[in-house]
């Protein structure tokens, strides 16, 4: 029997009736990521504490997050996009200026867009950081002062279970393999053969209120316009039911769910 080294993490179990985590690389047919990005989760934590230094802590590897979830289906619906400004007569128009000519008003841009949306999403989120910060997050998230939304405001979340502390172990005892109970994100470095699994690209944007304060791309709070594209990065998406031999996993910890071990793929900021 392998000796187990245990540490605590904060667990959030959320239900979203509908959700869109828009892939910024898609346009006329806008697609959704299957789960929220890690920075989206950091944004929820920032909003709960009403402070904006957690993103920097995540960048410094002082906070790790794990994003898991299962959903019932993904459907596509039709959206009519209208771009313009509302004027006194309730018409929607665009201002257009040309070289050395006065501004003129033209009809607004209108175009059809197809958009993916997730139906009936259950999220299982884990956060690992220092004990004091975990206690602060637990206190605030146990009694939220406002509606919890994951990413965009329409992605309203409800607790399936109250936030709680769980024990995370470094080893998987004497097991040779594990089967995922939840779909999850993993870093390519977690997997021996990461090229075998679906790879998704993410875009990270920094928001600067002043030179010392930065906001997460999905902070979910009032914030200034993006100041710069910070980085592109890739994560693997692993689906529920996939089996993995432990020898093919690297830097992974484990959680007991219904007396069975579930791998936890910690995601932190990597330059």
Go through each PLM region and give its residues:
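General N-terminal targeting signals
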Residues: 27-31, 38, 52, 58, ...
């Amino acid at each position: 029997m392998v000796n187990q080294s245990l540490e605590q993490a904060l667990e959030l179990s959320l239900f979203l009736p509908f959700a869109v985590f828009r892939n910024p690389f898609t346009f006329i047919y806008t697609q959704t990521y299957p789960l929220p990005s890690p920075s989206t989760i950091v944004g929820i934590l920032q909003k709960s504490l009403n402070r904006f230094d957690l993103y920097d802590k995540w960048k410094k590897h002082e906070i790790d997050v794990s994003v898991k979830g299962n959903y019932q289906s993904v459907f596509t619906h039709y959206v009519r996009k209208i771009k313009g400004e509302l004027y006194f007569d309730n018409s929607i128009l665009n201002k257009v200026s040309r070289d050395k000519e006065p501004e003129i008003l033209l009809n607004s841009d209108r175009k059809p867009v197809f958009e993916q949306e997730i139906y009936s999403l259950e999220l299982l989120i884990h956060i690992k950081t220092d004990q004091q910060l975990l206690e602060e997050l637990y206190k605030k998230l146990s009694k939220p002062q406002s509606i919890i939304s994951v990413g965009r405001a329409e992605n309203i979340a409800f607790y399936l279970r109250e936030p709680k502390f769980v024990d995370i172990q470094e080893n998987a005892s004497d097991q040779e393999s594990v089967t995922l109970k939840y779909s999850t994100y993993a870093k390519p470095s977690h997997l021996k053969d990461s090229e075998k699994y679906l790879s998704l690209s993410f875009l990270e944007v920094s928001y600067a209120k002043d030179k010392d304060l930065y906001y997460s791309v999905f902070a979910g709070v009032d914030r200034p316009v993006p100041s710069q594209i910070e980085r592109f990065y890739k994560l693997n998406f692993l689906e529920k039911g996939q089996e993995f031999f432990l020898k093919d996993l690297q830097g992974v910890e484990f959680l007991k769910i219904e007396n069975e071990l579930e791998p936890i793929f910690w995601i932190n900021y990597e330059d």
